[in-house]
């Protein structure tokens, strides 16, 4: 959503657009890393408490983006923001498995994947108009507000779909054993490869397009969006 603001961010932080794009790369790294962390936490503490933590972290990091004074700070905060963000993604997948049967789950997952696939295409358009009207900081205010509303909705209306398992250990050895069990399954690599191929092109375009359109071709924020 902040992609149309890369040029404005670069100007305000006295850097170049390619350096700003590193904040997007670190966000993707944070998303990948965070999913490994939240899986065990969701089994140990239930679905809602880790979700509350992640959303709160996302809100605080989004608001912190308003006060950055250099690109290094933005890159680090975007990583933290990603760690908070992926709590919702992991919890959503876990809740689908809790609440739906094996036959129903594929339909629900298909709907989730549709949202995940469409949102990166629609977000720059909304972000372009926000940035043109209110500046690039407004995007992070908007994201923080959306996360705050999600947090309230989770507290008031979202039921706990999983009873926490007190015996589940957060020690590294059993967690790594579970990961190794998954890695030994041939089917895992098939699904992982398909997912990687599907999203790699999209993310490559998303990360490089601001440099091409805004830095080289001088396209405006709304025009890029």
PLM features: what roles do these ranges have?
Residues 161-191:
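Juxtamembrane intracellular "pre-TM" segments in multi-pass secondary transporters
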Residues 69, 73, 111-156:
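Helix-loop-helix hairpin linking two adjacent transmembrane segments in secondary transporters
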Residues 61-66, 81, 97, 154:
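MFS-fold secondary transporters
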Residues 77-118:
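Cytoplasmic helix-loop-helix junction between adjacent transmembrane helices
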Residues 9-10, 41-42, 126-134, 214:
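Interfacial helix-cap and linker-helix signal at transmembrane-aqueous boundaries
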Residues 1-17, 38, 205-210:
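Extracytoplasmic
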Residues 33-72:
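Conserved MFS/SLC helix-loop-helix module at the cytosolic interface between two early adjacent transmembrane helices
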Residues 25-38, 93:
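Central cavity-lining transmembrane alpha-helices of secondary-active solute carriers
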